[in-house]
Amino acid sequence: MKKVIFFTDFKKLHEALEHFDIQDFAGKKVPVKLHMGELKNKYFPRPDFVKQVVDELKKINADPYLFDTTVSYTGLRHSKTGYLKLAKIHGFTKKKIGCNVVIDDLGIPTTIEDREYEVAEHLADSTHIFAISHVKGHVATGMGGTIKNFGMGGVTKETKRRMHHGSRPVYLKD
């Protein structure tokens, strides 16, 4: 990662991307990693903002697609079909955004410091990734936007289960 840019004025997205070497994305398939929300929850990046990012990537001949992974708990995001339905409800469609929406539940086994993780196949196979994140806390990955977006959202359900299991409180009887 070359640079991290924080901004709040979405009208200045083009200017912000000028500070980021977006030309490196030209000619590449680019997963745009984001959380497309939960049912009845308004805290997720807005589709109109995401479309601006997709449009900027397309201007330089990148091939972007929206990307996320399924979750281990019950709900629409538990399956690819359910998550795609939820994405549509929240306005994340090819027609509205201008690119495909890909939900992954397959992983590539990856070992780091003697721990095995299943990294989402589309992320493991990518040379370039663009992340759009909202700030959120998580017991296993801490407070963060993009770090949490990849820490929990870039792995398979099985890896998520293992990470959550490791952070459960333990009751010790005296």
Where is each model-derived feature located?
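N-terminal and secondary-structure boundary signal
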Residues: 1-174
